[in-house]
Amino acid sequence: MTPTHNFAFCVATSISFSCLLTAAELPKHIAHEAMWQDRGNISALNLTYGQGGEQHQPSGPFTFVKEDSSGTSPKFEIVDQQGTRWKAKVGEEARAETAAAHLLWAAGYFTDEDYYVAELTVANLPKLARGNQMVTAGGVVHGVRLERHMSGQEKGGTWTWARNPLQGTKEFAGLRVMMALMNNWDLKTINNVIYKTGKEKGLTYAVSDLGATFGKTGNPLVRSKSNLKDYQSTKFIQHVRQEDVDFHLNSRPFFLTVFDLPNYITRTRMQGVVKHVSRAHAGWLGGLLGGLSHEQIRDCFRSAGYSDVEVEGFAVAVEGRIAELTKL
């Protein structure tokens, strides 16, 4: 086998109404190993608040705890007067991640309790190593996604798209489709978390970082996050066959960047996450999401701080993708 063929082989294998239900009113039973939970009547869900519901929305005052240097987005931890800890994220991922978490929750998947706050005052806030441009006098931080630390929940490691206990189920296939629907181009294993929840420590599988969504997928020179124009310009379904379907998700770098072989292989494998998805399973998700109203979908983006024009644009684009799924 020639070096070129050998390399190719390596790569190849490699909403808001008072009658709406909040998260606290939903069934609490979780199977021992799960990534999806039946939300009941999806048309009655309140997508303004997502997983945490209205009762868990943040309320100050807040005090700085420490800065978090992980990942690419500026983050820091704060605590409210009730002692609840929150992780604050600022930058271009803040709005996209909030909207994505609320939409994913509505589809039945486990997510973090994410809220978007346009302006947040934090006591004892020092000069930040990252994101200090989002801070003004008096410790006022602008454009913040707050992730609530959930009591009784522990992280139990990570899971991979290639190997996990939910493979082959319609729920796992649906999650793969959701990643394509939201244009999530950052499907690294480190973003997939296993949570131990409740007294019996049942395991729930979740995608914990959804910031690289609602933009354009592609190589580092063209991909984007939280960009309406880019999101509207991309296609959703790539190929439809008798039994399965491929979705668009471009993540692989230029071939000329192959000197970073591990990254090249990792990004190539990410594209495979949304390929060869069962048509029946993708159609199941489409039927589920088809129960959402235009106003519910708008609430996903309104709750994330987008402008009226952006809210309408994103909602229409998402509805278009749902319509494509229902035709499978």
Regions found by a protein language model. Give the residues of each.
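Sec/Tat-exported extracytoplasmic proteins
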Residues: 80-82, 107-108, 179-185, 322-326
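Conserved kinase catalytic-core segment
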Residues: 96-97, 102, 154-234
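Conserved ATP-binding subdomain of kinase catalytic cores across diverse folds
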Residues: 49-161
